[in-house]
Regions:
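C-terminal effector/interaction modules appended to NTPase cores
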Residues: 32-200
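Canonical P-loop GTPase G-domain recognition
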Residues: 1-19, 23-28
């Protein structure tokens, strides 16, 4: 079967991401009267007046204004970079998440599927910087649960992980952070392990 004709028959998977969420990339405070949270909307839409929840602080505030560039708008949607001003002070910094009904969770440990790309093997007990969304924190690989045969999908017992191998690993973080399953929220469901010495 030709590739083009096959692609024409493929059933496109429905987008399963829920609610609104925006990882905060930067806090903008040009003067004492304005404090805006900048980032890209990863899912959903936000409108002036909406009630948002801040994570991990779990505070609630209403949207006072939304800026796209230097233009104030009443609504912004997925994919747009925005500055959001809230109607009261909240405990938010880079790496925090603004959300409405997203169902994202706070946790200090996850089980993640890892594709290992380093020449040196991965072993239990290795420390990393872990980047999820706009947040980067210290983390630890506490256990390699099993590796996955890329040809058969078979799960195999594993104690180390070599370059280009895939495994399920348990990770612990230095603090509770906002995460979710990749199928539910892509940005909050993917992570990068960064070597604390080489930054690679």
């Amino acid at each position: 079967e030709a590739l083009l004709s096959h692609l024409e028959t493929v059933d496109i998977k429905e987008d399963t991401e829920k609610g609104f969420y925006m990882p905060v990339q930067r806090v903008c405070r040009p003067n004492h009267e304005f404090r805006g949270f900048q980032g890209q909307i990863e899912n959903g839409a936000i409108r002036a007046g909406d009630l948002v929840t801040t994570l991990p602080s779990k505070e609630e505030a209403h949207v006072k204004s939304i800026l796209v560039g230097d233009k104030e708008v009443q609504e912004a949607v997925q994919g747009q970079p925005v500055t959001i001003q809230l109607d009261r002070e909240v405990d938010v910094s880079r790496g925090c998440v603004l959300t409405i009904d997203s169902g994202a969770v706070l946790t200090d440990s996850v089980e993640a599927d890892i594709l290992w790309m380093d020449d040196n093997a991965l072993t239990d007990g290795k420390n990393f910087f872990v980047k999820i969304g706009t947040k980067m924190i210290p983390g630890l690989v506490t256990k390699i649960n099993y590796s996955v045969d890329v040809n058969t999908g078979e799960k195999k017992s594993a104690y180390t992980l070599k370059k280009n191998e895939i495994a399920s690993c348990t990770l612990e973080f230095s603090e509770k952070i906002v995460v979710d399953e990749f199928d539910r929220h892509r940005t909050l469901g993917e992570l990068i392990l960064i070597d604390r010495v080489t930054n690679m």
